């Protein structure tokens, strides 16, 4: 499985997931008004969001 780890004007960066990690995730955490910290990567299970964030998971490549 290959997951996107970052997006920018220059394109995307990806990561090959380790054995047992079969989910890609994207997590947004609110840092301030209209300001979010976004992290992406591989996971064995979908992580849970905290009270200031949101998580989206998928099990497909990129």
From Swiss-Prot:
Chief localisation class:
secreted
Q: Which cysteines are joined by disulfide bonds?
A: 3-24, 17-42, 46-57
Question: What keywords is this UniProt entry annotated with?
Answer: Disulfide bond, Secreted, Toxin
InterPro entries per UniProt: Snake_3FTx (IPR003571), Snake_toxin-like_sf (IPR045860), Snake_toxin_con_site (IPR018354), Toxin_cobra-type (IPR054131)
Tissues expressing the protein:
Expressed by the venom gland.
Any one GO MF term held by the record is:
toxin activity
Q: Where in the cell is it found?
A: Secreted
- Coiled coil (UniProt feature): none
- Gene3D superfamilies, per database record: CD59 (2.10.60.10)
Q: Name one GO cellular component term.
A: extracellular region
Give the record's family classification.
Belongs to the three-finger toxin family. Short-chain subfamily. Aminergic toxin sub-subfamily.
Protein role: This protein shows a synergetic toxic effect in that it enhances the toxicity of other toxins.
Q: What does the record note on quaternary structure?
A: Heterodimer of C8S2 chain 1 (AC P01410) and chain 2; disulfide-linked.
Q: List the protein's name.
A: Synergistic-type venom protein C8S2, chain 2
Species name = Dendroaspis angusticeps (Eastern green mamba)
């Amino acid at each position: 499985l290959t997951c996107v780890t970052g997006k920018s004007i220059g394109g995307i960066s990806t990561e090959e997931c380790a054995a047992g990690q079969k989910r890609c995730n994207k997590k947004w955490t609110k840092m301030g008004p209209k300001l979010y910290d976004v992290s992406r990567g591989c996971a064995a299970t979908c992580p849970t969001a905290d009270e200031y964030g949101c998580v989206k998971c998928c099990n497909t490549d990129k």
